[in-house]
Design a protein with these regions (language model features):
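Non-catalytic interaction/Regulatory regions outside core domains
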Residues: 1-114
């Protein structure tokens, strides 16, 4: 399945994800479900930055997921080492369920890390 189809499936099964973007190993947007291309690029950039900053605080330990809770929802960035999915959610999401849904979306993409 390609990244676009994986995002379509994510939105079919998840009621808590509002928007999402998948980036490839180089950080390029492979697929997005956002209001605009500019929003997709911004979301991808913020996700990469959050993962990078947290990884820098962990002394060499890999970081798979970061969740930032905001007033109106959350930002969740999750990586499998090859691709990254960054999503915004409804307010007070079920964190483990969102993480599961994002991990499953990455797992559906052909050529990704398993």
């Amino acid at each position: 399945m390609d990244a676009s189809a994986a995002l379509s499936e994510l939105f079919r099964v998840s009621t808590q994800v509002v928007e999402a973007v998948v980036t490839g190993p180089g950080g390029d947007v492979e697929a997005a479900r956002t209001s605009s291309d500019a929003r997709a690029q911004a979301l991808a950039g913020v996700g990469a930055e959050v993962l990078s900053r947290v990884a820098g605080m962990r002394a060499g330990e890999p970081v798979e997921r970061v969740q930032v809770d905001l007033d109106g929802g959350s930002l969740v960035a999750l990586t499998d080492g090859a691709r990254t999915v960054v999503a915004t959610t409804v307010a007070r999401p079920t964190a483990a369920l969102v993480a599961h849904d994002l991990r499953a979306a990455l797992g559906r993409i052909e050529g990704g890390a398993r």
